[in-house]
Design a protein with these regions (language model features):
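Extreme N-terminal starter segment of soluble prokaryotic enzymes
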Residues: 1-3
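Active-site HxH/HxHxD metal-binding segment of metal-dependent hydrolases
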Residues: 11-12, 23-26, 33-116, 130, ...
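Conserved catalytic cores of phosphodiester-cleaving nucleases, focusing on short active-site segments
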Residues: 18, 27-29
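Anionic group-transfer/hydrolysis microenvironments
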Residues: 21, 32, 148
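Short active-site segment of divalent metal-dependent hydrolases/proteases
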Residues: 59, 63, 123, 149
Length: 150
């Protein structure tokens, strides 16, 4: 499994590229709108980005999840938590899945499980990461977005 932090010093914003080297599939969490840097990084690692996810709605920068869904043919994963005022309405017409606490999905041999973690924003999700390809049945880490800064 590839787990890569992409950090923008100007925005003080972190995103993550997580890829299954066995299947060549990858996902990006909290990408910036300009998705070319992620596509280039994935290609350099022999990966194809098939999904993009948000941990929460971003007010401080433009998310690239929609751009991946529209231009990159990637499935979008967004939160269904937080009530009607905290939903990503832009996903209509895109290949997407609305996630709630406990929902899981897989990219390659990696399982991601949504954990509702309100605080920073009401709809915020963190994602438990389990490397099924490595034989794991318990999470090896968690992607928290702006819920926890490490």
């Amino acid at each position: 499994m590839l787990f890569r932090l992409i950090y923008d010093d100007d925005l003080a914003q972190a995103s993550y590229l997580v890829g299954c080297q066995r299947t060549g599939e990858a996902i990006v969490f909290d990408p910036e709108r300009d998705i070319d840097r992620y596509l280039d990084l994935a290609a350099a690692q022999g990966l194809r980005i098939v999904a993009a996810a948000e941990t929460h709605i971003h007010a401080d920068f433009l998310s690239g999840v929609r751009e991946f869904a529209v231009r990159g043919n990637a499935k979008a994963y967004v939160s269904g938590e937080g009530g009607a005022d905290w939903q990503s309405g832009w996903v209509d017409g895109c290949d997407h899945r609305v996630l709630r606490d406990g929902d899981s999905f897989e990219v390659g041999n990696i399982r991601f499980t949504a954990v509702h973690s309100p605080g920073h924003t009401p709809e915020h999700l963190s994602y438990l990461v389990t490397d099924l390809g490595g034989g794991a049945d318990t999470p090896m880490g968690v992607i928290t977005g702006d819920f926890v800064f490490v």
